[in-house]
């Protein structure tokens, strides 16, 4: 045996020699441990090594191991200038879009960004990353990204990296724990390998890369050099070792035979008193109901698995709490954990759903309690006073005012008032319709395709609200004046040179003798065409005559463009000192001290200096939870009614509780909709009036008789009579959303807003994009005139509603002709003519998938759902005006779209039911189509559910109960 151990020792010595040679090879590559840089001296030395390597070596490797919580990321490594924070090199992980961003300064001094595709690394598990920066001594730079030892992406022919400053003390190395946008998880290692191969870099992070020929030959050569002199000796020793094992095997066999004879003799000897051994499973040592099986191993038995709903080793079992492990019930508090199982309590009041109970975590995860809202307004015959408004909300309902045409309240009842049908004569024009106002007055409005004051109406070819010829109106109403552009919509009637021809149809709008297509100041006379900069705007109309600024943006409207204005927002603080350069904030409040003022900070309470907002929902990524219980587009942490959809977030008394879930909106002590102890309902729900004075006993208090929301705009002209925050249609303030932000030839839309925000023009043949207003709505009526003012294009345009973020919105879009999209990657998309209504719920967000899905006429799984399409399959006509009317009631999922050509309705979606978005913002949409006009835009708050919805609601309830 001693000789055998000697042979084994010799073999181990040989193997250790090989391992030692490999280990020595690993140490040949210089490595900088970034996490170990503790003082300035160490940092300077590291920068000097790195700077020399970037000049003399071909490759440098960034290596790290880390953990990231779901959807979080940050900067992994960065090289910055200590004096001005200039980036030399920065590597950041963008987990929400599964990308690694590499930013570096090129030799020409400009910042270059490379987006590299990465698998999901934000899952809470350990991850390894290697970034190879190659081609350092060549004309072009190359990048290779390895995630968990596999090549994830690469980029070739990149511009070279700029040299680091000669003075190493000017450069600061920041790791993910010290960067501005720090890593949100934990970082175990962060190293820089200076030179070497991918295999050697992999060896430093325990990544056994295969196929690296150079590394393989090095190791193989070393093994041969070490084993070459010992091969014969090693073979001889192994032969001896094999002989010893054979002899040992024979000895063991003899011992087994002898022990068997002794055992049989003992068992057959009755005098010894041995008896049949008792069963280890009697009595059953296992948990009640668990099977027992005898074994030869200690303790002589083995228990089966614990019963369903329990966990343990079979001997001891304890109950599993399915409520905490799986949360199967509609609300966490409704789950009751029982011995071996769980039971869900009944659905909350105002909701309906089948009972649910079961056993085990797997069952609880695969079966969820479903509770659907009961529409008391439909199911309860007398939920509210007859002829009053009943508003269904999730789990309940509330009673509003009397319906249009009735007067009174919930206590006294609602009685008929003067109405259009009860009039002894019709005061409206034959081409107009009667409209009942909130206060009971009657007014007239011209039908679509006609314009005037309602009492007198004339033909309106371009449907912009002005008649083709002037009308003899008694009140000299402005909409009785002749349209200065009969065939091109221009609801603002702009006429720069006052020649009676509107700017939209005037070939020389400013009257300077130079045609618009050649004029560098289309609306300002400038015969000399002087242009001191290079932005295509002449000095006479350029708000920055000596500084190029294509967008001519002027945030503070002081006549000086942002590009040359040292105080862009006009708050008295210069841009270089202003923590919100484009939003007035003279107090400069900055609660999270991230250098961005609260007035413009997308996360005012959490530091986020980069202000990234991937999904364009106006909430920064670092504080964006995407948890929205009621689906109204506001995450629960920012929602003033987290369980009731209320996109408008109206809070009339500023008590932090939204009006839709506040029993006393104006905080005057009078309940809004129900009488409590003889008090209420409030006859002025939004204006404090404890005395409830109502001189004419019409059910509306004196203080809100003609201005219900007290916003100084009479209800007759107020587009939202029950919201003091919205008074007129206005898109002058809007958010631009680019739906395909990456591409070879990126052309973004150019939006021009006219007529005080009631007309929008898009001039470019652009990539898909949106212009979205900042006002969010619950129920809304949205209408406008659509006109393509060109004959050279045939693509898509339309309007949007229910916008919550760049992955969640509704779009009404129209294509002129059938066409296959010219980029077949990631999939072939076919557009068809005809008006379409789509619900966008995109898993990927802005990019090539959403782009092709919008172009495609049908459904695209995980991206876009087609809700309705005009069966006529008719495209829009060049230079032809159309009027669309849209109604959306998100509380019940009601959607209806109507389209008019002239005065004739040519398309009607009928009632469409969809609850993908429970409210949101409004805007317009374009995709590869130029010269689009959205004119005479109007929106109006309206939560009243139309009568044509009732039959659809019954069908929905019947389907749920079955």
From Swiss-Prot:
Residue intervals of the EGF-like domain: 277-318, 319-358, 373-412, 416-458
Instruction: Give GO cellular component annotations, separated by semicolons.
Output: collagen-containing extracellular matrix; extracellular region
Tell me where the TSP type-3 repeats sit in this chain. 459-493, 494-529, 530-552, 553-588, 589-611, 612-649, 650-692, 693-728
* Acidic residues bias locations: 557-570, 652-669
Q: Output the InterPro entries linked to this UniProt entry.
A: ConA-like_dom_sf (IPR013320), EGF-like_Ca-bd_dom (IPR001881), EGF-like_dom (IPR000742), EGF_Ca-bd_CS (IPR018097), Growth_fac_rcpt_cys_sf (IPR009030), NOTCH1_EGF-like (IPR049883), Thrombospondin_3-like_rpt (IPR003367), Thrombospondin_3_rpt (IPR017897)
Enumerate the spans annotated as TSP C-terminal domain: 732-946
User: Which Pfam families does UniProt cross-reference here?
Assistant: COMP (PF11598), EGF_CA (PF07645), TSP_3 (PF02412), TSP_C (PF05735)
Q: Does the keyword Signal apply?
A: yes
Q: Which Gene3D superfamilies match?
A: 1.20.5.10, 2.60.120.200, Laminin (2.10.25.10), TSP type-3 repeat (4.10.1080.10)
Which UniProt keywords are listed? Calcium, Cell adhesion, Disulfide bond, EGF-like domain, Glycoprotein, Repeat, Signal
Query: From which residue to which does the signal peptide run?
Result: 1-23
Q: GO molecular function terms here?
A: calcium ion binding; heparin binding
Q: List the carbohydrate attachment sites.
A: 313, 409, 646, 710, 942
* Disulfide bond positions: 281-292, 286-303, 306-317, 323-335, 329-344, 347-371, 377-390, 384-399, 402-414, 420-434, 428-444, 446-457, 473-480, 485-505, 521-541, 544-564, 580-600, 603-623, 641-661, 684-704, 720-941
The annotated region (Disordered) lies at 548-704
- Compositional bias (Basic and acidic residues) at which positions? 631-641
What's a BP term from Gene Ontology annotated to this protein?
Answer: cell adhesion
Functional description taken from the UniProt entry: Adhesive glycoprotein that mediates cell-to-cell and cell-to-matrix interactions. Can bind to fibrinogen, fibronectin, laminin and type V collagen.
Description of how the protein assembles with itself and partners: Oligomer; disulfide-linked.
The family assignment reads: Belongs to the thrombospondin family.
What's the protein here called? Thrombospondin-3a
């Amino acid at each position: 045996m001693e000789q055998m151990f000697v042979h084994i020792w010799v073999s181990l010595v040989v193997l250790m020699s090989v391992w030692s040679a490999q280990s020595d090879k690993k140490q040949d590559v210089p490595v900088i441990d970034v996490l170990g840089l503790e003082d300035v001296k160490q940092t300077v030395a590291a920068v000097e090594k790195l700077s020399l390597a970037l000049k003399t070596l071909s490759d440098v490797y960034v290596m790290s191991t880390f953990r990231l919580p779901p959807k979080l990321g940050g900067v992994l490594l960065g090289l910055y200038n200590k004096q001005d924070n200039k980036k030399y090199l920065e590597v950041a992980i963008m987990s929400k879009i599964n990308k690694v961003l590499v930013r570096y300064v090129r030799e020409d001094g400009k910042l270059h960004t490379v987006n590299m595709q990465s698998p999901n690394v934000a899952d809470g598990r350990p991850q390894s990353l290697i970034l190879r920066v190659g081609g350092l001594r060549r004309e072009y730079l190359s990048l290779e990204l390895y995630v968990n030892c596999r090549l994830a992406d690469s980029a070739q022919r990149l511009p070279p990296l700029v040299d680091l400053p000669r003075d190493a003390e000017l450069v600061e190395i920041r790791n993910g724990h010290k960067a501005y946008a720090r890593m949100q998880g934990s970082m175990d290692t962060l190293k820089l390998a200076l030179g070497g191969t991918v295999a050697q870099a992999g060896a430093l992070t325990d990544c056994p890369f295969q196929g690296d020929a150079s590394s393989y030959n090095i190791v193989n050569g070393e093994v041969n050099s070490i084993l070459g002199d010992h091969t014969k000796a090693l073979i001889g020793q192994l032969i001896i070792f094999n002989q010893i094992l054979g002899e040992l095997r024979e000895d063991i066999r003899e011992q087994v035979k002898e022990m068997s004879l002794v055992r049989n003799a003992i068992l057959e000897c009755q005098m010894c008193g041995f008896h049949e051994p008792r069963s280890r499973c009697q009595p059953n040592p296992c948990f009640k109901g668990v099977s027992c099986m005898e074994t030869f191993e200690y303790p002589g038995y083995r228990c089966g698995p614990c019963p369903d709903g329990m966990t343990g080793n079979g001997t001891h079992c304890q109950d599993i709490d399915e409520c905490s492990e799986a949360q199967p019930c509609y609300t966490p508090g409704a789950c009751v954990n029982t011995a071996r199982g769980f039971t869900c309590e009944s659905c909350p009041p105002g909701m309906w759903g089948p009972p649910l109970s079961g056993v085990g975590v797997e069952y609880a995860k695969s079966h969820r309690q479903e509770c659907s809202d009961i529409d008391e307004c439909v199911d309860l015959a007398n939920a509210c006073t007859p002829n009053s408004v009943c508003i269904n909300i999730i789990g309940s309902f509330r009673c509003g005012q009397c319906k249009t045409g009735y007067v009174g309240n919930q206590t006294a009842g609602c009685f008929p008032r003067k109405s259009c049908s009860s009039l002894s004569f019709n005061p409206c024009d034959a081409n107009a319709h009667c409209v009942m106002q909130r206060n009971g007055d009657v007014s007239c409005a011209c039908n679509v395709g006609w314009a005037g004051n309602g009492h007198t109406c004339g033909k309106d070819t371009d449907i912009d609200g002005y008649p083709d010829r002037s009308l003899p109106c008694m009140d000299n109403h402005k909409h009785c004046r002749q349209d200065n552009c009969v065939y091109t919509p221009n609801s603002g009637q702009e006429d720069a040179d006052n020649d009676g021809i509107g700017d939209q149809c005037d070939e020389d709008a400013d009257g300077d003798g130079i045609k618009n297509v050649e004029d560098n100041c289309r609306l300002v006379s400038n015969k000399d065409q002087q242009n001191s900069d290079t932005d295509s705007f002449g000095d006479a109309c350029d708000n920055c005559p000596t500084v190029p600024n294509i967008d001519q943006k002027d945030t503070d409207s002081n006549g000086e463009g942002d590009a040359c204005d040292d105080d862009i927002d006009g708050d008295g603080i210069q841009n270089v000192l202003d923590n919100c350069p484009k939003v007035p904030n003279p107090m400069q409040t900055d609660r999270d001290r991230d250098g961005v003022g609260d007035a413009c900070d997308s996360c005012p309470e959490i530091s986020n200096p980069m202000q990234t907002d991937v999904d364009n929902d106006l909430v920064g990524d670092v504080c964006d939870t995407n948890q929205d219980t009621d689906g109204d587009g506001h995450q629960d942490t920012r929602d003033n009614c987290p369980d009731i959809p209320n996109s408008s977030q109206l809070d009339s008394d500023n008590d932090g509780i939204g009006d839709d879930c506040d029993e006393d909106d104006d905080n005057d002590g009078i309940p809004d909709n129900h009488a409590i102890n003889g008090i209420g309902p409030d006859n002025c729900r939004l204006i404090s009036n404890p005395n409830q004075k109502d001189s004419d006993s019409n059910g509306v208090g004196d203080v809100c008789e003609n201005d219900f929301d007290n916003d100084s705009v009479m209800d007759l002209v107020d587009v939202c009579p029950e919201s003091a925050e919205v008074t007129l249609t206005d898109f002058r303030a809007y958010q631009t959303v680019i739906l395909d932000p990456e591409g070879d030839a990126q052309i973004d839309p150019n939006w021009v807003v006219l007529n005080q925000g009631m007309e929008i023009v898009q001039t470019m043949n652009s990539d898909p994009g949106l212009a979205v207003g900042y006002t969010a709505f619950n129920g809304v009526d949205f209408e406008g005139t659509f006109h393509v003012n060109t004959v050279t294009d045939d693509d898509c345009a339309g309007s949007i509603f229910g916008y919550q973020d760049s992955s969640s919105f509704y779009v009404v879009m129209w294509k002129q002709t059938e066409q296959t999209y010219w980029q077949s990657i990631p999939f072939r998309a076919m557009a068809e003519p005809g008006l379409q209504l789509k619900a966008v719920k995109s898993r990927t967000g802005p990019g090539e998938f959403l782009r092709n899905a919008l172009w495609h006429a049908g459904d695209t799984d995980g991206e876009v759902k087609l809700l309705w399409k005009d069966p006529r399959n008719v495209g829009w006509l060049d230079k032809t005006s159309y009027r669309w009317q849209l109604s959306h009631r998100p509380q019940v999922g009601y959607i209806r779209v109507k389209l008019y050509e002239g005065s004739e309705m040519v398309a009607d979606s009928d009632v469409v039911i969809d609850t993908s978005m429970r409210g949101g913002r409004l805007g317009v949409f374009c995709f590869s189509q130029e010269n689009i006009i959205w004119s005479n835009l109007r929106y109006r708050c309206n939560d009243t559910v139309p009568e044509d919805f009732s039959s659809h609601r019954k069908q929905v309830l019947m389907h749920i109960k079955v």
